[in-house]
Amino acid sequence: MLTNTRLVHGQHDHSRCVDAALSRAEDLCQKKNAKLTPTRATVLSILWQSHRPLGAYQVQDRLSKITGKAIAPPTVYRAIEFLLRLGLIHRLPSLNAYIGCPFPNSEHSNLFMICIECGCVAEIADASLNTRLQTACDKTNFKLHSQNI
């Protein structure tokens, strides 16, 4: 885990991240004939508003504040499941939380650096790591299901 927030994520405009994520989501949904509902889009926006993972109940709280209505947990979980299925977000099991995926259209290892001071998360796609992991699996007759480094 990294402890230097500048290494994890430099200064930038988070609204650009949100806009780019929504644009990628719209494109992907169109290609897969899936519907990006307003609730799903808002949940995705919430997860991209910072580079910190959020739990489902944190997402629920923010969604309720944005809409001005009480949002039931199943509504949030359905949106999260949809976004996970399309690869638009990741679940971080070690934190029981979710974060936006900057590489939804590509096969990649889910390698995350997590700052222990501020909670910032950076995802890294490393093709050589994928290759090494697959080679190790092939040699040992394992099928890669998930990893935690």
Regions found by a protein language model. Give the residues of each.
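Short helix-coil-helix linker/hinge
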Residues: L36-T39
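Short helix-capping/hinge SLiMs at alpha-helix to coil transitions
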Residues: K32-A34, W48-H51, I66-T67
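Short, Lys/Arg-enriched N-terminal segment that forms or immediately precedes the first helix
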Residues: D19-N33
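DNA-recognition alpha helix
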Residues: G55-K69
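Pre-recognition alpha-helix immediately N-terminal to the DNA-recognition helix
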Residues: A41-I46
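Non-DNA-binding regulatory cores of transcription-related proteins
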Residues: L84-I149
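Basic amphipathic alpha-helical segments that dock to polyanions
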Residues: L47, V76-L86
